[in-house]
From Swiss-Prot:
Its main location: cytoplasm. PANTHER family: ACTIN. It catalyses: ATP + H2O = ADP + phosphate + H(+). This is Actin, cytoplasmic. It holds the Pfam family Actin. It is an enzyme of class 3 (hydrolase). GO terms for molecular function: ATP binding; hydrolase activity. Its EC number is 3.6.4.-. PROSITE patterns: ACTINS_1 (PS00406), ACTINS_2 (PS00432), ACTINS_ACT_LIKE (PS01132). Belongs to the actin family.
């Protein structure tokens, strides 16, 4: 492989979850929230070995006495000190590997600032001393995971949604579109909808309850207006949810009004296009000859595409925009929550990929900017 025969480590840094594992595996070994928690009041946790900060699941479990922070916002690392803690946790606690012995593949959102990639590279080589490193674009990896080399990926995670047209394994840079509207915004919007019926969730800890409600109960309506009408006429579709304190709340039309935001960002006053228009616009930026293949291979990826009914609705909305003779096919792989990671696992274990790594020697010679030459 590279310097040694150690398998590569693949880390998919999401705004909401960090997925990590060993190249060649078919699923990540660790998936934990990208959260750092610091005690609200130092010295309050009696009888526990108080740490200055908690990472991932542990922060999640103690969220009542912590202030929670996400170091990745909209797919971009905003706090490198916190991010370092997450990577450290990844290597030493979750995977139990020494980074000095393994090549490391990280992922990033398309159109990320150049400085962001350089800092990532610098941290990996200088803090963790990895022997070699690579950074790949998330959507391209998702397409690999679905077994295609041509298609358009609609990738929606916790912090950013993007549509990336890919032809023969190469992302077409002019046809990459992104909106900063994703899972975290849906969670906020869900809080707002529940507030309207008198349920007030506001703290960082309660937000996690809302996220759970969103993931368990929400779905995308095929026809929004008629769905609204159906809920007004009967309460058969209402679902109850038990809160951690034992109380039960009833979730009504919020179940589909929340994910509807993906198609109508105007609900929260955003002037973004919805994901159907984003997909269509991205395809229209491509060459006429390629469009047929793209319409026929719309691949969903990321946790925010896990809502039941989303594939059918996207297919319906894109069909309304596309030429009438065009065949539209939306692919929703069941493992799409992890497809970016799976694509990274496939890519980094290919024998043809082994020459692509940035080695420590190359980094020492050229500095962090080498990442723009070797990873595109």
């Amino acid at each position: 492989m590279t310097d040694s025969d150690s398998p590569a480590i693949v880390i998919d840094n999401g705004s909401g979850m960090c997925k990590a594992g060993i190249a060649g595996d078919d699923a990540p070994r660790a998936a934990f929230p990208s959260i750092i928690g610091r005690p609200k009041m130092p010295g309050i946790m009696v009888g526990m070995d108080q740490k200055e900060c908690y990472v991932g699941e542990e922060a999640q479990a103690k969220r009542g006495v912590l202030n929670l922070k996400y170091p990745i916002e909209h797919g971009i690392v905003t706090d490198y000190d916190d991010m370092e803690k997450i990577w450290h946790h990844c290597f030493y606690n979750e995977l139990r590997v020494t980074p000095e012995e393994h090549p490391c593949l990280l992922t990033e959102a398309p159109q990320n600032p150049k400085l962001n990639r350089e800092k990532m590279t610098k941290t990996m080589f200088e803090t963790f001393n990895v022997p070699s490193f690579y950074v790949a674009i998330q959507a391209v990896l998702s397409l690999y995971a679905s077994g295609r080399t041509t298609g358009i990926v609609v990738d929606s995670g916790d912090g950013v949604t993007h549509t990336v047209s890919i032809y023969e394994g190469y992302a077409l840079p002019h046809a990459i579109l992104r909106i900063d509207l994703a899972g975290r915004d849906l969670t906020e919007y869900c809080m707002k909808l529940l507030y309207e019926i008198g349920l007030n969730f506001s703290s960082t800890a309660e937000r996690e309850i809302i996220r759970d409600i969103k993931e368990k109960l929400c779905y995308v309506a095929l026809d929004y207006e008629s769905e609204l009408k159906a809920y007004k006429e009967s309460s058969t579709n209402d679902k109850s949810y038990e809160l951690p304190d034992g109380n039960t709340i009833t979730v009504q039309d919020q179940r589909f009004r929340c994910p509807e935001l993906l198609f109508k960002p105007a609900f929260i006053g955003k002037e973004f296009p919805g994901i159907h228009e984003l997909t269509f616009n991205s395809i229209m930026k491509c060459d006429v000859d390629v469009r047929k293949d793209l319409y026929n291979n719309i691949v969903l990826s990321g946790g925010t595409t896990m809502f039941p009914g989303i594939a059918e609705r996207l297919s319906k909305e894109v069909s309304a925009l596309a030429p009438s003779s065009m065949k539209i096919k939306v692919v929703a792989p069941p493992e799409r929550r992890y497809s970016v990671w799976i694509g990274g696992s496939i890519l980094s274990s290919l024998s043809t990929f082994q020459t692509m790594w940035i080695t420590k020697a190359e980094y020492d010679e050229s500095g962090p900017s080498i990442v723009h030459r070797k990873c595109f």
